[in-house]
Curated annotation (Swiss-Prot):
InterPro entries: AAA+_ATPase (IPR003593), ATPase_AAA_core (IPR003959), Lon_bac (IPR027543), Lon_bac/euk-typ (IPR004815), Lon_lid (IPR054594), Lon_proteolytic (IPR008269), Lon_Prtase (IPR027065), Lon_prtase_N (IPR003111). Belongs to the peptidase S16 family. One of its GO terms (cellular component) is cytoplasm. Residues 11-204 form the Lon N-terminal domain. This is Lon protease. It comes from Buchnera aphidicola subsp. Baizongia pistaciae (strain Bp). PROSITE patterns: LON_N (PS51787), LON_PROTEOLYTIC (PS51786), LON_SER (PS01046). ATP-dependent serine protease that mediates the selective degradation of mutant and abnormal proteins as well as certain short-lived regulatory proteins. Required for cellular homeostasis and for survival from DNA damage and developmental changes induced by stress. Degrades polypeptides processively to yield small peptide fragments that are 5 to 10 amino acids long. Binds to DNA in a double-stranded, site-specific manner.
Length: 780
């Protein structure tokens, strides 16, 4: 019997994606395509009947008749609702299977001529048997599949039509789209129910296997924690499928690695404990990841691996000389240090701390020492570190914990005796809550670092074989930390030293870096001297290197743009074409002789500096005003200087009561820069005397020294840096404390040759030498 009716019906067609509609099925549909919305509206305007056909490929947005299955379901639109976003929600009820004979696309939506499909009739007895058998099978299926509600079974028990029962069961079965369409295209009720029962039988078998796996896993879980359930279930599945590979146990590999590393006994016991703990854990657990990470760190750390240390001092001296010009005293101290270490075969001893302004070669000197000794070089920048955990590490109780920077660097370098450079040790941040400097005490103390304890490792690590060298711009370091280091000062370079450094190191380096050939660029020595004098004013050579780099870049540009240009020669005449106008004057000061203006000398982290000090006397009520971001010590120096002037007012020809009707204002320009220290005492006193007596101060004289209330001049620090600053600034005469005369032996002769340095004991000598006219008392 042919189930298809002979008559054709014209009806709108709605293409569906990823869903198959059966008869008796009530379902909401969301319609968004313009063509589909027109189809719904056309159906609503007629008899609310529509043909629902599924697309073969859901990804197609504009399907044709070839993209649709030929068998679908006629449906009745129960409800339609237009949504704010322009889409339409419709509630449809499947009515009857139908076959599409011809599709038209003339009115902006699909219509089709269809034939309704009638289900072949079966006897009442046969129908009763099929219903009972199918319901029993579905009930058995529901027992294993907990995702299907038992209430569905109750609703199916009331169905007396076998065809309707088959469609309702198909609705609730987790079938693929192709399987659902195949069941829709099965007209015969007997065949349809048989296919569904076969699918249910297959699903029941799979569910029974899954249940068997779960039961096996639960038995295995009795000896372990429930959190390992997922991993054990995976193992059981692999065992069921026969895909379990017999590979070398990971724990055995780790155990072999640990035995090959010669760890201290404490570390070996800790590793054995952690390995046993890892073995008892599931690899999928979070705790196992933490333990595995810990074991990996312990394996990476160099417990007994050393690099061979060179002990040839002659070779070490050659390396230091080839890498750095000058710095003779620094090199001598380093060679002494290396000589002692080579004899006692250990590095226990003072930790060297190279202190000097930026650009003088502190960091590169550390690299040279590493090369001279054959040690591997590792650098740790301490600038901005403000947490002790950066040094000691975090305890493993914290999520994402890691060893401190010390242990991390040791693991990276791979040997236990590298040269470890602690760069910018004075730039660490400290406050009342955190103090990383205290954590460094254990690292730098030779008596303690044999058992350095990182919070993450939880075992002691021997740092006694590491050669630590620190660098700093100043000695503003916590006293306990400073006490553990030997300070080696690296002062600024002289003009002669800068010239040689530029010729031997900086110029070849910049020519190579900017891809120039040696014969393409010539820079005369006089040009380098002019750059040092007129374009830089620094203790080191960093800005000098920048200016040379600027010349090289411009030369490369000119050579590329001008193909006929083969060589470039830089002379003093064309230097301004490359570097612009001169930034500084050399050999002359910037000031004329003025009343109340004195040039002092300061010593800062970046080297020596000229410090202009101004004083003015104005009508007032005896106030002392000081401005210019002055620190407490400098403010006290001003008060001491004023007291000296008041105590000797008669001798200076100043009225005794000058302070009653006058205010004295002392100012140090560049107010945004903080200034402090006692060494400007004599300069403050000279400026005050000058403004009160009206005698100008000589502009070619600079001075430095602390003053007492008796007018005595006390010693100061940083003499070499201050004299270098005076030389750079074109100062001819410098007044220094008498007790600092012995320090002149440390000053290069090239500097002393261009300066007249006059040691002074008392403020009388200072005033006689620095003022244009001799004060009243000096003639006595």
């Amino acid at each position: 019997m042919n189930p298809e009716r002979s008559e054709y019906i014209e009806i709108p067609v709605l293409p569906l994606r990823d869903v198959v509609i059966y008869p008796y099925m009530v379902i909401p549909l969301f319609v968004g395509r313009d063509k589909s919305i027109k189809c719904i509206e056309a159906s609503m305007n007629k008899n609310k009947k529509i043909m629902l056909v599924t697309q073969k490929e859901a990804e197609i947005d504009e399907p044709t008749d070839n993209d649709l299955f030929t068998i679908g379901t006629t449906a009745s639109i129960l409800q339609m609702l237009k949504l704010p976003d322009g889409t339409v929600k419709v509630l449809v009820e499947g009515l009857q299977r139908a076959k599409v004979k011809k599709i038209n696309n003339e009115n902006g939506y699909f219509t089709a001529q269809i034939q309704l499909i009638c289900t072949p009739e079966i006897t009442e007895k046969e129908q009763s048997i099929l219903i009972r058998t199918t319901l029993n099978q579905f009930e058995n299926y529901v027992k294993f599949n907990k995702k299907i509600s038992p209430e569905i079974l109750n609703s199916l028990n009331n169905i007396t039509n076998a065809s309707q029962l088959s469609d309702m069961i198909a609705i609730h079965m987790p079938l693929k789209l192709s399987e659902k369409q195949s069941i829709l295209e099965t007209y015969n009720t007997n065949e349809r129910l048989e296919r569904l029962m076969a699918i249910m039988e297959s699903e029941i078998d799979l569910l029974q296997v899954e249940k068997r796996i779960r039961n096996r896993v639960k038995k295995q879980m009795e000896k372990s924690q429930r959190e390992y359930y997922l991993n054990e279930q995976m193992k059981a599945i692999q065992k069921e499928l026969g895909e379990m590979d017999e590979t070398l146990d990971e724990h055995e590999i780790l155990k072999r690695k640990i035995t090959t590393i010669k760890m201290p006994k404490e570390a070996q016991e800790k590793m054995a404990s952690e390995l046993h703990k890892l073995k008892m854990m599931s690899p999928m657990s979070a705790e196992a990841t933490v333990v595995r990470s810990y074991i990996d760190w312990m394996i990476q750390i160099p417990w007994n691996i050393r690099s061979k240390v060179k002990k040839n001092l002659t070779q070490a001296q050659k390396i230091l000389d080839s890498d750095h010009f000058g710095l003779d005293k620094v090199k001598e101290r380093i060679l002494e240090y290396l000589a002692v270490q080579s004899r006692i075969n250990t590095v226990k001893g003072p930790i060297l701390c190279l202190v000097g302004p930026p650009g003088v070669g502190k960091t590169s000197l550390g690299q040279s020492i590493a090369r001279a000794t054959g040690r591997k070089y590792i650098r740790m920048a301490l600038g901005g570190i403000r947490d002790e955990a950066e040094i000691r590490g975090h305890r493993r109780t914290y999520i994402g914990s890691m060893p401190g920077k010390i242990i991390q660097k040791m693991a990276k370098v791979g040997v236990k005796n590298p040269l470890f450079l602690l760069d910018e040790i004075d730039k660490m941040s400290c406050d009342i809550r955190v103090d990383p400097a205290s954590a460094l005490l254990e690292v730098l103390d030779p008596e303690q670092n044999v058992a350095f304890n990182d919070h993450y490792l939880e075992v002691d690590y021997d740092l006694s074989n590491v050669m630590f060298i620190a660098t700093s711009n100043s000695t503003n370091i916590p006293a306990p930390l400073l006490d553990r280091m030997e300070i080696i000062r690296i002062s600024g370079y002289t003009e002669f030293e800068k010239l040689n450094i530029a010729k031997s190191y900086l110029k070849p380096k910049q020519i190579k870096r900017n891809a120039l050939k040696s014969n393409e660029l010539t820079i005369e020595d006089s040009v380098v001297t002019n750059i040092i004098r007129y374009y830089t004013r620094e203790a080191g050579v960093r800005n000098l290197e920048r200016e040379l780099s600027k010349i090289c870049r411009k030369c490369v540009k000119n050579l590329i743009l001008n193909k006929s240009l083969k060589k470039i020669k830089i002379t003093t005449d064309n230097l301004h074409d490359y570097l612009g106008i001169k930034k500084y004057d050399f050999g002359k000061t910037n000031y004329k002789n003025q009343i109340g203006q004195v040039i002092g000398l300061a010593w800062t982290e970046v080297g020596g500096e000229l410090l202009t000090i101004e004083a003015a006397c104005i009508s007032g009520k005896g106030k002392l005003i000081y401005t210019g971001s002055l620190g407490e010590v400098m403010q006290e120096s001003i008060q001491a200087a004023l007291t000296v002037v008041r105590s000797q007012a008669n001798k200076l020809g100043i009225k005794k009561n000058f302070y009653e009707k006058n205010d004295i204002h002392v100012h140090v320009p560049e107010g945004a820069t903080p200034k402090d220290g006692p060494s400007a005492g004599i300069a403050m006193c000279t400026a005050i005397v000058s403004c009160l007596t009206g005698i100008p101060v000589k502009s070619d004289i600079a001075m430095t020294g602390e003053i007492t209330l008796r007018g005595q001049i006390l010693t100061i620090g940083g003499l070499k840096e201050k004299l270098l600053a005076a030389h750079r600034g074109g100062i001819k005469k410098v007044l220094i404390p008498y007790d600092n005369e012995k320090d002149l032996q440390e000053i290069p002769k090239t500097i002393l040759k261009g300066l007249f340095v006059h040691p002074v004991k008392h403020i009388k000598e200072v005033l006689n030498l620095s003022l244009e006219n001799t004060p009243y008392f000096s003639s006595k």
